[in-house]
Amino acid sequence: MNLYIRNNTFWFELENLTRLFFPNEKINVYREFQSVEKPFILASLDDEITVSVAIGDFEAEKTAPVCADNGENELSTVKLLYQILHDFSGIDQPWGLLTGVRPIKLLRKLRAEIGTEASDRRFLEDYYVSPEKLRLADMTEENERRIIELSRPESFSLYVGIPFCPSRCSYCSFVMASVERAKKLMQPYTDLLCEEIRATGQIAADLGLRLETVYFGGGTPTTLSPEQLDQVLGAVNSSFDLSACREFTVEAGRPDTITAEKLFALKENKVGRISINPQSVSDEVLQAIGRKHTAQQFFDAFELARKCGFDNINTDLIAGLPKDTAEGFRRSLDAMLALDAECVTVHTLCMKRAATLTQDGKTLNREEAATAREMVRYAQETLTARDYIPYYLYRQTRMVGNLENVSWSKKGYESLYNVYVMDETHTILACGSGGVTKLRDPDSDFLSRVFNFKYPYEYIGRFDEILKRKSDIKRFYCDLHS
């Protein structure tokens, strides 16, 4: 698909919107051109806004008046393109023309500016969001708001990254290393990670920051040995003041990494919340996506975690997986409810460019989108009926069916960290490879980022640079108070 932009700077939103309707096609963006070539979209801003589309035998053009507000001109242009592509495809996008990661944050911002009624009307009439998704957004925003209000100006959360997994799932694009390839890196990485944690803890103490939540992600943190887990968790406990900490989560995502010894190491180090993620309870689906464990291993790991005293367990499912069906997804969700999991997170398959599913030529089609929407609809209806509440929602590009990821929990079991990181409520200090520290000015929306190296071998080989970058944290807070 060729996207031609004339006399405007709206190419980013127009490209993202085009990708909603043509997820498998390369989109070529031209801002300087002499002529256009089919199939094309032409968006121009002259005496009026004009959007023209020509795809095969289909041709259409729509116009709108130009106004003084460039933001409104951009919205008008995107709306015109959405209307034409909707007419061409017959597809009702659940989130309309919204393509951003954080629709709940947008809704909250609009409510603060123009009120609830006007912001809901904006979602429905200007953004073409479906009534069903607006209701979901309304519920999520209300539940998020209660969590956000717990944060103080001096609050922060800690993220610790463990970039190792037993194997790579076919839908995954995260930077991580499989155990068989990276075993020799694990102990050196662990030792240096503890050093970074200690340095970060000292900075937080010097600045008088208040630790609200701790989150171990990855990768799969429980890929580490019990001794290594104890080493890293112990570094957190000895380096930070956890007296005000409301939540300590560890992703124990892969059932094939979970043992009693590791669970005891978590318990001994004040971890109160874990995730054990089946993705599906169909062995055929698990095999198709490269998960080298069985459904029974998940059930065994969940039971073991209960026996070890964990009473706040999240489970992840993915709608739209290869080989899965609507009935298969229903069985998976019903199994999570039968286990009485405190939290069920329903992801939608995202075809990321770095994932092997995408590299192997897997494409999105309308039938798969319809199936994924049926799965997500069943999850929302069933979880709501069982008194689970949506408290965390985000979206990604190239999601099957243009859907969303939603965490549902029993009341009182929401993950605070998930809300804080997605809303960008307060500072997140990150340790480990791939970590991104986000420093937030509590009096504004201003964010400053400090990046760690992505790969474990880089992290180990250039660790001195990681420590030097920590000075940016103190500099940020000193500048706030100068």
What are these regions (language model features)?
Residues 209-210, 214-218, 228, 399-405, ...:
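Amphipathic, soluble alpha/beta structural segments
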Residues 88-92, 112-158, 207:
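N-terminal [4Fe-4S]-dependent radical SAM core
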Residues 27-37, 354-431:
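A C-terminal junction/extension of Radical SAM enzymes
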Residues 1-116, 126, 147, 193, ...:
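Radical SAM enzyme core and accessory elements
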Residues 161, 275, 344-348, 419, ...:
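Beta-strand scaffold of nucleotide-dependent catalytic cores
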Residues 51-53, 160, 276:
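Short beta-strand motif preference
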Residues 155-190:
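Canonical Radical SAM [4Fe-4S] cluster-binding loop centered on the CxxxCxxC motif
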Residues 176-378:
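Conserved non-cysteine loop/helix-boundary elements of the Radical SAM core domain that shape
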